[in-house]
Amino acid sequence: MSRRLFTSESVTEGHPDKIADQISDTILDALLREDPTSRVAVETLITTGLVHVAGEVTTKAYADIPNLVRNKVLEIGYDSSKKGFDGASCGVSVSIGAQSPDIAQGVDTAYEKRVEGDEDELDKQGAGDQGLMFGYACDETPELMPLPIHVAHRLSRRLSEVRKNGTIPYLRPDGKTQVTIEYDGDKAVRLDTVVVSSQHASDIDLDSLLAPDIREFVVEHVLAQLVEDGIKLDTEGYRLLVNPTGRFEIGGPMGDAGLTGRKIIIDTYGGMARHGGGAFSGKDPSKVDRSAAYAMRWVAKNVVAAGLAARCEVQVAYAIGKAEPVGLFVETFGTAAVDTEKIENAIGEVFDLRPAAIIRDLDLLRPIYAQTAAYGHFGRELPDFTWERTDRVDALRAAAGL
């Protein structure tokens, strides 16, 4: 079979774009905590010494946005100008307006009710925008995620962990990881290259201190976890590149401006699946960019967990103000155990993909989003990540005739 290399990347919570994502979702959580019906679309820009928050919100809740911003920045680890940013002293600018009544009309009273007179409660809420969303799952890891993004996220999480627990005390919050894996056909067989770039204190020698510490306490630690998880991958002789520029002292918002929604491939499947283009952070679940993408992950993961396919990508599409999806597409890449049309029909029978039904079934009107904003929205089986449940396996198998 043909051999090929596939690469995915991740970033730490201290990357400027991820700081912005976490701030946006922290504000969302604060509003949902007081008013679960809040409509929120919050964007964050972060640059040297300044955080600017803008967007549209309709809510009965109050949020002390400057205080939320500062606490989140400090929690991430930016507490000194020596690190390039200080949450205690940075400026915070807020420009929040109300949601457009034209959008609210379509969300609050869907096309099905306004035009067709439908009285079904779940038909009353329309999609918050038009758009297309993808979900993906495969059997490369126990979490049914692609292996390259799985490993890249683990490396990024570990990079932050060794900084926070003092194992590598001279690290700073900003960091990136990248993983290249060799595939034989569709099977991951060998780790080819690992890239780790981490912000660090001044006067740290790359060759004698940083690179050996990263190899021992970050990379080898993660590779040992893969073995514990039963993932078979040849890791002998992999290439490790640590801070290939030679130095990474200036980082965080001082090194690069950060924006909400700039890491959508890292947030999802690391490039292994297609993406509809919509970002997640700062958006309440009436926005199908977020809620339907979560639902598609739920669908695809249940399809693979049910044994209907080894790889599954699902696309859904919506029209603004309409409850029912306008399109559903299933791709199994030649791995289906039954006819793909049967899988598509089974999905339609088992899953209700109207926005109100997604919000109900995944219990999305909760303050759960800040924890999604770093290290991936998918593949982490945390209690609040309801879209990672495989609770429709039996129903799918029955509907597909297995």
UniProtKB/Swiss-Prot annotation:
Keywords: ATP-binding, Cytoplasm, Magnesium, Metal-binding, Nucleotide-binding, One-carbon metabolism, Potassium, Transferase. ATP binds at residues 15, 174-176, 247-248, 256, 262-263, 279, 283. Residues 99-109 are annotated as: Flexible loop. Pathway: Amino-acid biosynthesis; S-adenosyl-L-methionine biosynthesis; S-adenosyl-L-methionine from L-methionine: step 1/1. One of its GO terms (biological process) is one-carbon metabolic process. InterPro entries: ADOMET_SYNTHASE_CS, S-AdoMet_synt_C, S-AdoMet_synt_central, S-AdoMet_synt_N, S-AdoMet_synthetase, S-AdoMet_synthetase_sfam. K(+) binds at residue 43. Pfam families: S-AdoMet_synt_C, S-AdoMet_synt_M, S-AdoMet_synt_N. Binds 2 divalent ions per subunit. Its cofactor is Mg(2+); K(+). It catalyses: L-methionine + ATP + H2O = S-adenosyl-L-methionine + phosphate + diphosphate. It is found in: Cytoplasm. Its main location: cytoplasm. Catalyzes the formation of S-adenosylmethionine (AdoMet) from methionine and ATP. The overall synthetic reaction is composed of two sequential steps, AdoMet formation and the subsequent tripolyphosphate hydrolysis which occurs prior to release of AdoMet from the enzyme. Belongs to the AdoMet synthase family. This is S-adenosylmethionine synthase. The gene is metK.
